[in-house]
Amino acid sequence: MTDAVQNETVQEASAQEENKLIAERRAKLDAIRKSCKANGHPNDFRRDALAGDLQKEFGEKTKEELEELNHVVAIAGRIMAKRGPFLVIQETSGRIQAYADKAVQKVLKEKYQGLDIGDIIGVKGALHKSGKGDLYVNMEEFELLTKALRPLPEKFHGLTDQEMRYRQRYVDLIVNEDSRQAFVVRSKVMSAIRNFMITKQFMEVETPMMHVIPGGASARPFITHHNALDMPMYLRIAPELYLKRLVVGGFDRVFEINRNFRNEGLSPRHNPEFTMMEFYMAYADYKELMDLTEELLSSVALEVLGSTSMPYGDDTVEFGGTYTRMSMFEAIKHYNPDHAQIQALTEEDIQNRDLMVSIAKSVHVEVESFWTCGQLLEEIFGETAEPKLMQPTFITGYPADISPLARRSDDNPFFTDRFEFFIGGREVANGFSELNDAEDQDARFKAQVEAKESGDDEAMFYDADYITALEHGLPPTAGQGIGIDRLVMLLTNTHTIRDVILFPAMRPQA
């Protein structure tokens, strides 16, 4: 028997076993419906305690102290294990056991025996402690609140299919403690960032999710159609241009935490919809943003995890202290010590396209015909340096032709006052001193339109209203976007974005 045939046989047997269990549970539910008024789904049980709180408050008390207290509680949750008279009940704060003594089992024998793993029940009783020191509820009464018709995966074959974890996240969250904790951390990260920004006098705002003109980043947009207006609209790829309009309007410090949508491929680091925090700060430059980012990230790590040092894969990353800062040009040279062409490269050579194409091909970059010198430099960096940036690093010196919204450097107008922040071998944030010269922005938008006409479908559109806003005067401003999903990946030591997005994009099953 081949492995494929054997696997198919195992799957068929598992499916048959699952169908049998489902049929048995449906029969139990039918019997319950005939014997109660709530059609098998009562809604009058109210819990007054959570497992986690009970463990904190009573976990250290002795068996004798608990017996003397005779503290009666009402708990509710999902049955995760059933071992004779003991049930393990799980809810949002943790797990606790419930014990049905012989008297309870005698009175409620049929009802108790009908309970299955996965059922949701409510239990009332006094807190006790087992001989092993485990806290439990001595069941005085219980009520079946929801009959689970499908067994949990461990019951028949285990949740071993990684893709199924993402398709049926509800099952993954029931059986996988690591998954639950990842999303608890995510929630705490969002709260910590929001609180930090508010303490720095930033105002939280909301900008449109549907745009008439997509802008704020170089990416392919999702296109929809507005029936009433009979016009195409675009899901936003970034909120940047709207946020800067607010700075023009007089809100000097604004931030937004929300979704962006980009019609691009899937990868361990990319999902078509993702969460960003973008903020803009008048009368500041990109160097001040780097300082603020160091403070923000170390603060978030400390608040969420209790430490600025944490494992990531085989490495340990450190969010505390001062982060490394180097230009993209310096990073390429630093991480390619044995590449003769790169070591001989000067900043002036970057504008020699033939030379840059030669170097790019030598490091296995597949070059597109419409790429500019700046794009070639970025691709060489991404191929040879980015994966090696495990510790917090700011990369500066981004060329203007790949930074259409960033202010040009006063020292060399080929470059901009822009940085990207890397940690764990990936980009997590992008920031720069904003371009507030309306005429320069007009010229760069036109260059983007030309690039789009030449085949670059990620190039930006021309936004005339944004030019009008700049003509009213944008004060010197710095702005930044931080990828929440990638940050959470680092803080949870996970290596695919699907593990930190509750419902990631998936191809429909056949």
Swiss-Prot record:
UniProt GO molecular function: ATP binding; lysine-tRNA ligase activity; magnesium ion binding; tRNA binding
Domain of life: Bacteria
Pfam families the UniProt entry points to: tRNA-synt_2, tRNA_anti-codon
Note on how the cofactor is bound: Binds 3 Mg(2+) ions per subunit.
PROSITE patterns with a match to the protein in the record: AA_TRNA_LIGASE_II (PS50862)
Subcellular localization(s) per the UniProt record: Cytoplasm
Enzymatic reactions: tRNA(Lys) + L-lysine + ATP = L-lysyl-tRNA(Lys) + AMP + diphosphate
GO cellular component, one term: cytosol
Cofactor(s) demanded: Mg(2+)
Keywords noted in UniProt: Aminoacyl-tRNA synthetase, ATP-binding, Cytoplasm, Ligase, Magnesium, Metal-binding, Nucleotide-binding, Protein biosynthesis
Binding residues for Mg(2+) 1: E420, E427
EC number, UniProt record: 6.1.1.6
Binding residue positions for Mg(2+) 2: E427
Gene Ontology biological process: lysyl-tRNA aminoacylation
Family per similarity comment: Belongs to the class-II aminoacyl-tRNA synthetase family.
Matching HAMAP family: Lys_tRNA_synth_class2
Quaternary context: Homodimer.
Protein's name in the database: Lysine--tRNA ligase
Organism: Vibrio campbellii (strain ATCC BAA-1116)
Gene from which the chain derives: lysS
